[in-house]
Amino acid sequence: MISVTDIRRAFLDNECHTITKAFGYLHEDKAIALIKIGFHPTYLPKVLYNNVVEFVPEKLYLFKPRTVAPLDLISTITKLKNVDKFASHINYHKNSILITGDKSLIVKCMPYMIISDDDIRFIREQFVGTNSIEYILSFINKESIYRMSYQFSENEIVTIINRDHFMYEPIYEHQVLDSDFLKTMLDRYGIVPINSGIIDELCPEAIIEILMAVVRPRDAIRFLDIVNKNQLTEDSVKNYIINDIRRGKIDYYIPYVEDFLEDRTEDLGIYANIFFEDAIDITKLDITKTELEHISKYMNYYTTYIDHIVNIILQNNYIDILASIIDYVQDVLTEELCIRIVCESTNPVPVTSLPIHSTLVMVMCIQMKYVDIVEFLDEIDIDTLIEKGADPITEYTFTTRWYNKHNDLITLYIKKYGFCPMMMKRLMFEYPLTKEASDHLLKTMDENRGAIMFFPRTICTLPYLLCCNYKLIQKPIPFKEENRNIVYKKNNRVLCFDSLENSAFKSLIKIDSIPGLKTYNMKDITYEKSNNIICVRFIPQESIHNEERRIKLQLFDIARLASYGLYYIPSRYLSSWTPVVNMIEGREYTNPQKIECLVILDLFSEEFIEYQNLGNAVSNKYELEYTISNYQAAINCLMSTLLIYLVLGSIRSISRTENFVLSILNIFYKGLKINELLSEPVSGVCIELNKIKDRASSGDSSFIFLKKNELSKTLSLCEKVCVETILDNNQSFKSSK
């Protein structure tokens, strides 16, 4: 349980109405300790500034921009890849950032700065050369474009749009463009020429051709707004738009229809009532299912005919359509119809729109995995919800007032997330708790210290363990005396590094000192410094030609190196998958969407990071919003690596999948020197891996896309292995398992 004793004391002693207010009364040391673990309000008092700068500078965004010193800001954001949280601070200190002349820093900050014409002139003076200014300007934001008079070149426009497609909108509003360029952009990028530069090129045929390319209602409305009215009255244009409306593109043409099609209501058919009040008696029409689907969004224009529409829906069993207009048909909904809507409609309906909140309807919602089950609390007590297997604690619940209405819901939240700084921060500092609800929350947490509320199941889950202050054991790397009497052949390789402090060089030297590695392809390493360059010479290891054996031994090496504090980041296979982040934020995670490479490649020293630098390295590699701990980053590395070697290894394996999986797990444990044996069957894992293997074998792609939850059993296995790794590294905790 997160310790809130000091916060509770401050809350009571100072008669605070919010927990945020109480946080401001904490002693600085106590406050900084909580800030370090990510447990803090959405803003901090000035008194904590110096301590935050010293101990957790990445949290400077919690102060108002004017409070943050420019040098402190620049020093901090220079080290971070993801600076989204500093957006207002970056813009506030724009001049200080531009004056640095640091191109990479300016590029990083461009999306957040409101750039003026004077700023562009300054940047041009700082960075001479067309390519430099074009590259820097490609990161500009739309707010800047709306405020400047600078005219972008066509090359600059293409570069900007290549980086962010939707930047076409402010650019096209900003300046008149050549018609040939506009046509090219339409053909190449599908960008509608909403620019006065196209007006002279328009004719009815061109207007229709452009409308055929429109994919956003806003673009259609804005394009028609610049077209000459005489051309909009052409019959060919009218006929095309009427047909487009009948195809369901209603939002695209609402202003146009009201201005130009008042005399064509009969041609519009059932859709006419959307634009003109009760223009058509729809009871005289033969209404199709497609038309009902199209008008369901606009049911407020058909209230006169609701009974007629409902009769058609029920006669034809169109439950999906009934669900889409549920707020207009409350009087006809029985318990049976509510259950049918819940079970048969493609999209979930809001629980608040279901007029009957019976236990049976609730059970059906639970089975269909509704996220707003909490709304049944208006009729059903929380114990019944839990008894029936409901989880009323979801993202949706934060959008309601239920936490202030039910103290039992807060208690349930604490049982689920009381160990998690991120999730408790959301409820305590970001949700508008009343004074009474805040008091209950602090009292419950303070009176249930330790892990008492999380026994017996939660304490052995990976999300719980990731939020605890545990460590992974690092064996000391043995000293290896350098051998200078090695005879190198001419074809032996040489690697060069810029300094002895280069992280890849340091990893290489440490790897060379670790005994028992099987596949690392460098041996007999020596190095010397020459002209400020570090030259490393080595003899390549002999290749292992048996692919399955190579994969297994390589995983052993990765695990062995991890046991010595050198961790492998498999980002070349998984470019954006960070399951640990989801877990520490209390969110569900699924398998990665894509594995970038289907071949297990050789290992290189630059892919291994020392444990003490791992949190920063992983956070920057994946451009996270905040820096995770070294411990959390290590588990992310181990889990990702194990998943990759299970999936890609099984694709390459010629053994029975079950034998391969068990072998991989044993090798992984052996490399980490963990005395564990898997006690559960892996048949479900094998089924998943075999499906992936069949799919990969039938294609010739160098990568593979994965469906959501396609590897749920495999992920569960990886999670359990990580749990065993943590427990083995923290024996005192393991005894409570």
UniProtKB/Swiss-Prot annotation:
The species is Vaccinia virus (strain Western Reserve) (VACV)
Matching entries from Pfam families are given as:
Pox_E2-like
Q: How does it assemble?
A: Interacts with host KLC2; this interaction promotes IEV trafficking by engaging the host kinesin-1 complex. Interacts with protein OPG056/F12.
Gene Ontology terms: biological process: microtubule-dependent intracellular transport of viral material towards cell periphery
User: What gene makes this protein?
Assistant: OPG064
Q: Which signals induce this protein?
A: Expressed in the early phase of the viral replicative cycle.
Check the record and name the InterPro entries matching this protein.
Poxvirus_E2, Poxvirus_E2/O1
List-wise, which residues carry N-acetylmethionine?
M1
Role noted for this protein? Plays a role in intracellular enveloped virus (IEV) transport to the cell surface on microtubules. Together with protein OPG056/F12, forms a complex that interacts with host KLC2 (kinesin light chain isoform 2) to engage the kinesin-1 complex and thereby promote IEV trafficking.
Q: Which GO terms describe its cellular component?
A: host cell
Alphabetical UniProt keywords = Acetylation, Disulfide bond, Early protein
The positions making up the signal sequence are none
The similarity comment for this entry is: Belongs to the orthopoxvirus OPG064 family.
As for PTM, the annotation reads:
N-acetylated on initiator methionine by host.
Which cysteines form disulfides? C496-C535
Species lineage: Viruses, Varidnaviria, Bamfordvirae, Nucleocytoviricota, Pokkesviricetes
Protein's name in the database: Protein OPG064
